[in-house]
């Protein structure tokens, strides 16, 4: 009996030793794997730091290049002014010489008239009749000059006084009027559908993807209206913003909603404001379900990705951020040299465009964060914007970007999509007499609409660059313009938000 117990004990000891050996082996393996993981983490952090350093170096080089370029431009301008001064001096000397020659000729003629026979009186001049025919060449953009940054403003946009406008090329209503380009037939008709009064300046307007609703942003309040009826269906106010008087509160106590954007399914609404916060609202309950924190200055622009899971934001803190709404975390931060005023996501979600105070439109890969294009005056034609870019919008096919600037122009950029070719400015739209504050493209890529501080909205023919008409429908700056995505070829809906505390919904009809 005792020998059998000894055998069991030996067997148990062997099993325990085997288990100990396995445990030691597993511990060593785990330690090895942990060490490998730590090595990988260390390498990843090192590479990420190197990538950030490279990116910062590139930004520093861009800034240095811009300063050098501006210095060269100033020197060129100085030399040009010197040449102009010399030309004027030479011209004045030549004119004085001509005047002396003319005086000598007149003296000779007077001497001849003393002895010459009386001349036959000249025939009366033929009366000149004023032509009522309009010279259309003054109103049409020369195809060879489409992309030029400097062009003449068409005459019908020079004087916006409706009383002086040709009756054949205007439409006048009690609350608005339309001026038409005389070089084209009046194919487009504009009518106001709804006028929506607000208690303060309307900073932004945005349609839902299905075109059934429109959201507006003003002081402390976001409102959602039914597009068909004009009925107010939601009034969104974050009451906690009044209670939490912290660093996010503005000195004046105001809290302007700078940007609004519907999610693709229309269930959520994102709002960006002066308090550096992005609020995500559930429209069915009219409650905030998420607050995204991270920006250090005002939020000026928002746009959803097509999948609805991500949101891009632009801020005065010189950054563009991509947010993962599933985690409420920022997944990517893109930093630039100056404040970001506007952002847009391409229709396929692969690209992000942003306009900035530094006169540049940047385009990034939305996945990697790599800078794909920089659209500015550094292009080979030197026809980029000459002042801050306040609005960008992708065309419906994603191949072009429209941009509006404080230099009073709208530009259309063609995206090459190839590393060996740079994107170019295809068209420069000239016609506004003050800052361009907002731009948008119609779904069929036929028209570009722009709103300006000159209180007007211009319909541009996207391909030719010709202004077709100007709508004067507000008593203050047109801060925001948006087009409904369900607009068709022959008719469409667009909206405007203004400093006159009104948002208006309009309809265009193509005859």
From Swiss-Prot:
Biased composition (Pro residues): 118-127
Keywords linked to the UniProt accession: Repeat, Repressor, Transcription, Transcription regulation, WD repeat
Region (Disordered): 90-128
Pfam families recorded: Tup_N (PF08581), WD40 (PF00400)
SUPFAM superfamilies, per the entry: WD40 repeat-like
WD repeats: 197-237, 252-293, 294-333, 335-374, 384-423, 431-470, 473-511
Skewed-composition ranges (Low complexity): 95-117
Function according to Swiss-Prot or TrEMBL: Represses transcription by RNA polymerase II. Represses genes responsible for initiating filamentous growth and this repression is lifted under inducing environmental conditions.
Protein known as: Transcriptional repressor TUP1
């Amino acid at each position: 009996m005792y020998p059998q117990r000894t055998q069991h004990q030996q067997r148990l000891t062997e099993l325990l030793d085997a288990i100990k050996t396995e445990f030691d082996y597993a511990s060593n393996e785990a330690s090895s794997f942990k060490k490998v993981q730590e090595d990988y983490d260390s390498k990843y952090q090192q590479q990420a730091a190197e990538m950030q350093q490279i990116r910062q170096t590139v930004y520093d080089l861009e800034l240095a290049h811009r300063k050098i370029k501006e210095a060269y431009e100033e020197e060129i301008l100085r030399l040009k002014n010197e040449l102009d001064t010399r030309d004027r001096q030479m011209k004045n000397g030549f004119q004085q010489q001509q005047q002396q020659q003319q005086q000598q000729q007149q003296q000779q003629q007077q001497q001849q008239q003393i002895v010459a026979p009386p001349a036959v009186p000249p025939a009366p001049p033929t009366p000149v009749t004023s032509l009522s025919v309009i010279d259309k060449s003054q109103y049409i953009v020369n195809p060879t000059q489409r992309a030029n940054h400097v062009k003449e403003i068409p005459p019908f946009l020079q004087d916006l006084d409706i009383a002086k406008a040709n009756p054949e090329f205007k439409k006048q209503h009690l609350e608005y009027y339309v001026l038409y380009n005389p070089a084209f037939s009046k194919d487009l008709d504009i009518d106001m559908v709804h006028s929506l009064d607000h208690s303060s300046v309307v900073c932004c307007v945005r349609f839902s993807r299905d075109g059934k609703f429109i959201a507006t942003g003003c002081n402390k309040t976001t409102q959602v209206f039914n597009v068909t009826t004009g009925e107010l269906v939601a009034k969104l106010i974050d009451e906690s913003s009044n209670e939490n008087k912290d660093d996010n509160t503005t000195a004046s106590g105001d809290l302007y909603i700078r940007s609004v954007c519907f999610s693709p399914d229309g269930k959520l609404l994102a709002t960006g404001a002066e308090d550096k916060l992005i609020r995500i609202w559930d429209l069915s309950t009219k409650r905030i379900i998420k607050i995204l924190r991270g920006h250090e200055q005002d939020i000026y622009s928002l746009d959803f990705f097509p999948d609805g899971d991500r949101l891009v934001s632009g801020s005065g803190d010189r950054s563009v951020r991509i947010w993962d709404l599933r985690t409420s975390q920022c997944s990517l931060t893109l930093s630039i040299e100056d404040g970001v005023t506007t952002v847009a996501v391409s229709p396929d979600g692969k690209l992000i465009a942003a306009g900035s105070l530094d006169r540049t439109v940047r385009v990034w890969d939305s996945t990697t964060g790599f800078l794909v294009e920089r659209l500015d005056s550094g292009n080979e034609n030197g026809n980029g914007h000459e002042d801050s870019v306040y609005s960008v919008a992708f065309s419906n096919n994603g191949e072009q970007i429209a941009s509006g600037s404080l230099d009073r122009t709208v530009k259309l950029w063609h995206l090459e999509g190839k590393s060996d070719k740079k994107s170019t400015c295809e068209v420069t739209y000239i016609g506004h007499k003050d800052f361009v504050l907002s731009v948008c493209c119609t779904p069929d890529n036929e028209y570009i609409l722009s709103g300006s501080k000159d209180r007007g909205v211009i319909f541009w023919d996207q391909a030719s660059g010709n202004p077709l008409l100007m709508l004067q429908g507000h008593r203050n700056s047109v801060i925001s313009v948006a087009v409904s995505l369900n607009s068709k070829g022959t008719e469409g809906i667009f909206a405007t938000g203004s400093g006159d505390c009104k948002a208006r919904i309009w309809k265009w009809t193509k005859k």
